[in-house]
Amino acid sequence: MKKNIINTWYSFVNIPNVIVPDIEKEIRRMENGARSSFSDDDGDDDSASMFEESENETPHARDSCRNNSQRRDPSQREQYLPGAIALFNVNNSSNKEQEPKEKKKKKKEKKSKSGDKNENKKDSEKKKKKEKEKEKKNKEEKGKDKKEEEKKEVMVIDPAGNMYYNWLFCITLPVMYNWTMVIARACFDELQSDYLEYWIIFDYLSDIVYLLDMFVRTRTGYLEQGLLVREEAKLIEKYKSNLQFKLDFLSVIPTDLLYFKLGWNYPEIRLNRLLRISRMFEFFQRTETRTNYPNIFRISNLVMYIVIIIHWNACVYFSISKAIGFGNDTWVYPDVNDPEFGRLARKYVYSLYWSTLTLTTIGETPPPVRDSEYVFVVVDFLIGVLIFATIVGNIGSMISNMNAARAEFQARIDAIKQYMHFRNVSKDMEKRVIKWFDYLWTNKKTVDEKEVLKYLPDKLRAEIAINVHLDTLKKVRIFADCEAGLLVELVLKLQPQVYSPGDYICKKGDIGREMYIIKEGKLAVVADDGITQFVVLSDGSYFGEISILNIKGSKAGNRRTANIKSIGYSDLFCLSKDDLMEALTEYPDAKTMLEEKGKQILMKDGLLDINIANAGSDPKDLEEKVTRMEGSVDLLQTRFARILAEYESMQQKLKQRLTKVERFLKPIIDTEFSALEGTGDESRPLDSTQD
C-alpha cells in the first residue's frame, strides 16, 4: 500500500499544472498521513527509504506545481481536472482505508498496554499470594518445630528442686509401709485376716505410687556438663540403662495374681515390693543435707533402723515358734490357747521384747532347746554384735561432732585463763575476757569466716561476701559511685571485729590505718575525759574513711580527730589502708575520684589546705614510687639470678650426660673402626691376585 501511495505521488508530480491549490492541500494532508503510516510500520525498511527519497523530492515538485499552475490557462486546467480528481479520489480512498487500520492498531496497542498492566497486576498479586503462602508455610513449619521441641523437651523435674524432694517423701511412705507391714502380715495370721480390706486398699495404693514413681524417674533430669538434660529420649535411655530400672520393674510385677491360686492368707508374695528401698535412702540423704540439725536427724535415722531390725527379728521369732509349735518348750512363744497369750497385741509385744533382749544382749532370755533354736540365737547374736557396734559407734561420733565446736571453744578459753594466771593478770581483766567469750558463744560468733569459706571457690566466696556486705559498703559516701568491680574487691577485704563495752576503737591523734563500718551495736564520740558524749553512732554508720586515703593538704594528716568508744558489745567491719590501696592499684580512675570526694568533704569541714592540695606532687609520693620501683627491680634481679642458676645447673647436667654417653660409645666405635680396617686389609691381596 505504501508503495502505491508513493507511485501515485510520483505520478501526481508529473501531472501538468492544472491542479488547484485545494488539491495541493489535500496532497500535503495525504503526505502527512503517509508519514504516520510509515512510522507505524517498523518492519518495512525499503518503503521507509523510498519515502525519505520522495520526501527529498517533494519541495521542488511543489514549487514546480505552483509555478505551472500559475502559468497554465484555465482551459488546460479543465482539461486535466478530471484526471486529477480521479487521482485524488484514489488517494483519498486509500487514505480512508488506512485510517481505520491505524485506529485498529491504536486500539490493539491500547489493549496490549492495558493487558500488560493487567498482567503486571496479576503477576504482582501472584507474587504477593506466593509470599503469603510462604509465610504461612514458614509459620506452620515453625509451629511444627515448636511442637516437636515441646514433644522432645517435656516437663522435667529438677533433682535438686523442692518438687523432687516432696515426691521422695511421697514414695518413702509406701516403701516404709511395705517394709514394716508385709513381714508382719506374713508372720501374724490374725493381722492379715482381720484387716484384709484395709490391706488391699493400702497395697494397691502403694502399687499406684510405685508406678507413678517409675514415670517420675523418666521425667527426672540429670546434669550433663553442668546443664540439665531435658530430652525425653535421653531421660528414658538413662533410666533404662540404670540398675534401678530393673529393680523398679521387679518391684511392680503383679505377684498379687497368685492370690487367686493360693488364697488371701499369703501376703509374703508381695515381698518384691521391698526392692524399692533405695528411694527411702535417697530421701533420708537429701533430708540430711537440707536440715539445719543434721546430727539430730542422723541419730533419729539410726534409731529408726534399729527399730526396723528389731521388728523383723520379732516377726521371724514368732514364725519360727509357729513352725516348731507354740508352747512346746520354754524358748518358743507360749501356747496361744492361753487367753493371756492369745491376743494379737500380746503376740507382737512379746516377740518384740524377746527380739530386743536378744539383739541388744542386755537381758536374759529363755535358753534354746532345739538345734534350730540354737542356730537362730547364734545368728541373732552375730547380727546384734555387728550391727549395733556400728550403730553405737556412729552415734558416739555424732555426739562428739555435736560437741566439737563447744570443746574447741572451751579449749581456747582454758588456754587464755592459764595465760592470764601465769602472767598475773588482774581479776577485773579476767572477768572482761570471760564475758567477751560468753558474748561470742551466746551470739554464735565463734565461727571463723575465713576458715569456713576457704573451701569454697573464689566465685562463690565473692558472691557470699557480696550478699552479706555489699549493701553496708555502699552506705559509705566515698564508695557510693564506685565501680562494681572495686566494690567487690573491697567486700572481700572487709574483716569482722567485735568490741566489748568500754573499748576504744580509736583515739584522737592516733594514726589512721583502718576505716570502720558499724554492723551492730552503738559507738559514742566522747571527749578526752571519756565520759562526755558528743554523738552516738548506730548501725550503718562509718568513720575513718578520710584518714586511709592520705589526702594531700589535709590539716589533720592521717591522724584521728576524735575519740570513739564502744557503749556495749559492737560488731564492726574493718577495711585497712593497705587493702584499699592494693585494690585501687587496678582502678586508678576510682582512686582519683575517691581523692576528689575526700577533698570535698575536707573543704566542707574546713580541714583542707588548698595551697598544699593544689601544689605539685608530694616528694613523699615520689619517694614511695622510687622505693616501689627499686623493690620491683630487686625482685626482677632475684628472678633473673634464679633463672641463670637453673640454666647453669642444666648446662652442667647436660655436659655430664654427654661425657657419660661418650664413654659408653667410644669402645663401640673403636671396635667398629678396627673391624672396618681389617676387612680393608683382606680385600687388598685379593685384588692383587686378580690382577
Curated annotation (Swiss-Prot):
InterPro entries hit by this protein: CLZ_dom (IPR032406), CNG_cation_channel (IPR050866), cNMP-bd_CS (IPR018488), cNMP-bd_dom (IPR000595), cNMP-bd_dom_sf (IPR018490), Ion_trans_dom (IPR005821), RmlC-like_jellyroll (IPR014710)
GO CC annotation: intracellular cyclic nucleotide activated cation channel complex; plasma membrane; rod photoreceptor outer segment
Positions annotated as glycosylated: N328
Bias kind Acidic residues: ranges: 39-56
Skewed-composition ranges (Basic and acidic residues): 57-76, 112-151
Extracellular topological segments: 191-200, 266-270, 321-343
UniProt-listed SMART domains: cNMP (SM00100)
Location in or out of the cell: Cell membrane
Stretches the record annotates as Cyclic nucleotide-binding domain: 484-604
Protein name: Cyclic nucleotide-gated channel alpha-1
Source organism per UniProt: Canis lupus familiaris (Dog)
